[in-house]
Amino acid sequence: MQQLIAEITKSQLKTDLPSFRPGDTLRVHVKVVEGTRERIQIFEGVVIKRRGGGISETFTVRKVSYGVGVERTFPIHTPRIAKIEVLRRGKVRRAKLYYLRNLRGKAARIKEIR
């Protein structure tokens, strides 16, 4: 039984994913269905956490839109994600960047890896 589950999940895993970590700035292209139409919506922000493993792995991206912080959690291997672009590599010393929720403006900047 365990082997069957492992086989099924292996077939569902995406292989074209870029490597990214918390602190990186991503542009996530999400497929959105509105009625009968399907379009691509772009969500750009900083990865504040990655959790899980295998098919159930998720990541959370945070951005500030019109002065309001917006966080969105995506399953990594979902077919709803068309593609993920890594825009910047950030240098951080934590795996979970929850402290960014309390910072505003320039204080919330993350150093870039050259």
UniProtKB/Swiss-Prot annotation:
Keyword flag Ribosomal protein: yes
NCBIfam families: rplS_bact
Role summary: This protein is located at the 30S-50S ribosomal subunit interface and may play a role in the structure and function of the aminoacyl-tRNA binding site.
Protein name: Large ribosomal subunit protein bL19
Pfam families, A to Z: Ribosomal_L19
GO CC terms in record: cytosolic large ribosomal subunit
PROSITE patterns: RIBOSOMAL_L19
